[in-house]
Amino acid sequence: MVPAAGALLWVLLLNLGPRAAGAQGLTQTPTEMQRVSLRFGGPMTRSYRSTARTGLPRKTRIILEDENDAMADADRLAGPAAAELLAATVSTGFSRSSAINEEDGSSEEGVVINAGKDSTSRELPSATPNTAGSSSTRFIANSQEPEIRLTSSLPRSPGRSTEDLPGSQATLSQWSTPGSTPSRWPSPSPTAMPSPEDLRLVLMPWGPWHCHCKSGTMSRSRSGKLHGLSGRLRVGALSQLRTEHKPCTYQQCPCNRLREECPLDTSLCTDTNCASQSTTSTRTTTTPFPTIHLRSSPSLPPASPCPALAFWKRVRIGLEDIWNSLSSVFTEMQPIDRNQR
């Protein structure tokens, strides 16, 4: 009986194989009356009865849900042949893989074919196959669809994440604390402003002395520039002008000796040796000043009896200092001497 049942099952599977491939994954088992359930992603289940169109007599009836060991052996022998035949007829579709996925609403690509002997293994495909009382075979007809699904929704590859990591580290390394030099900062352009530690103030040489004979003083000024800065600054942006005031001398200023405009030479010019004495006094009184110092207040002559005259002298000295500072910035403009006005 076992070889006859196996041969009969093989003939029926050969006849019904192409028909099952055209019915979107429906496989008709070689039974006269069998219940077939269709599930296409929704909770709705449709059941109908199909009659195998064969000329078999009614007494040769094959029942798959029988618990007979002979039928189980026949099913086990015909299982590999049926699996190979159905694997050749690949069909696509959607079906629920388990009852849990049916509740979630998630679907699995590929037709999942369950060939079992009892209704429990047919309703729950996740049950343990090949148990003592039942025989179950579960395979995926379309085995390439899961791979295609994976390639269409590829996650971020680890190689790409490692390539993006140095870029993020470079971006983070640019945000450093003030005063520090970032390691991966791009090279600055030649016209860009250098860092504060690279800027140095360089004072220019002193200009010529400007005599103020009526006030008895002389002054000179010098400007400064930022070393390491390419380009030009606007006038007045540096604000590093230095001015030096000293009492005038007859050696450096063409002042009138008779009017005693220079106060340092007044007490020394008492006789004909005034020129030699003034030269000596100039050498002794001229002292070097530091290179960078704050502006000192101009030395004023002894207090005059008229307060208004002393006030306007201070105003004139201040205006002359401003003019000399501006003239040192504009090199083409020469300061105007008071005696030439």
UniProtKB/Swiss-Prot annotation:
Keyword terms of this UniProt record: Phosphoprotein, Secreted, Signal
Pfam families: PMSI1
Stretch list, region Disordered: 115-196
GO BP terms, alphabetized: regulation of cell population proliferation
PTM remark: Phosphorylation sites are present in the extracellular medium.
Compositionally biased residues, Polar residues: 127-155
Tissue expr: Plasma. Overexpressed in lymphomas.
Domain of life: Eukaryota
GO cellular component terms attached to this protein's record: extracellular region
Keyword Disulfide bond assigned: no
Residues of the signal peptide: 1-23
Stretches assigned to coiled coil: none
Compartments where found: Secreted
Function description: Involved in control of cellular proliferation. Onconcogenic modifier contributing to the tumor suppressor function of DNMT3B.
UniProt-listed PANTHER family: PROTEIN MENT
Protein name: Protein MENT
Species per Swiss-Prot/TrEMBL record: Homo sapiens (Human)
Lineage: Eukaryota, Metazoa, Chordata, Craniata, Vertebrata
Gene: MENT
